[in-house]
Amino acid sequence: AILPESGYMGGYTYSAGFGERDAWFVTPLFDADSGAPLALLDGASMNPFKTGAAGAVGIDYLARTNASTVGIIGSGAQARGQLRATDTVRDLSEVRVYSPTRANREAFADEMGNQLDCEVQAVDASADAVVEADIVITATNADEPVFDGDLLDPGTHVTAMGQYNPTKRELDTTTIERCTYVPDLRERAMQDAGSFIHAVEEGVVDESHIHAELGEVVAGEATGRETDDEITVFDSGGTGIETVAAAGMLYERAQEDGVGSTIQFAPASEALTGR
């Protein structure tokens, strides 16, 4: 992705698919004018913070201003990133977390309860997290919906960020049908947003159900939440723009704080000619 306004370009480069071996994410950042390399970042470590920040923007523009209770499904690094970022845009009073493994959800509750100025409790079912929550966050690798959309109270905001595969989904058709649907990218909603694609295939909604991209709402080109009773969904699959913007910010902070190691790359004309 290229950000002409900031002068940066870059994106994720990663290796994966080597059997059961791990994956590695690297984020190179370049000068968009000269093409010169500026920084090389650990993309995997950056990702939960970047993705959490995108989720927080969605909450800031789509959740009720007085939203204070959060139900979160998932207890991994992405769930932690989402909750930390959410805490920066809303005054949270209570968080309820569910994930299938009791030890994981209890560890999440203990850790995040120590970090946030609110109560964080582990619950025994996804329904217990969702019912009466002002904000619901899903950060899972589930293949099928993780809660019943009929449980959502009017006025709830949902951030779904764990699944961007056309055959998998975190949200059921009821949730999509009831909501004002805002993806990060309109074209992605029809390509790999499994929750939305399933609802289309079931004949419940069509492409016109996409209210706007989040960027359009932020830019004032489309409305966000219009009523307190409205159910809103931000379907976050991640974008190259988010990655480059986050990398650019970290690069600038590193320069200001004098952190990081400097390495030199020879331009191709020099390396290949020896001049």
Language-model segments: what does each one mean?
Residues 1-46, 56, 66, 212, ...:
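N-terminal ligand-binding/catalytic initiation module
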Residues 52-58:
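Well-ordered mid-protein domain cores that form the structural environment of catalytic cofactors
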Residues 55, 63-89, 93-104:
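Glycine-rich adenosine-cofactor-binding loop
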Residues 107-111:
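Short alpha-helix adjacent to the SAM-binding motif of class I
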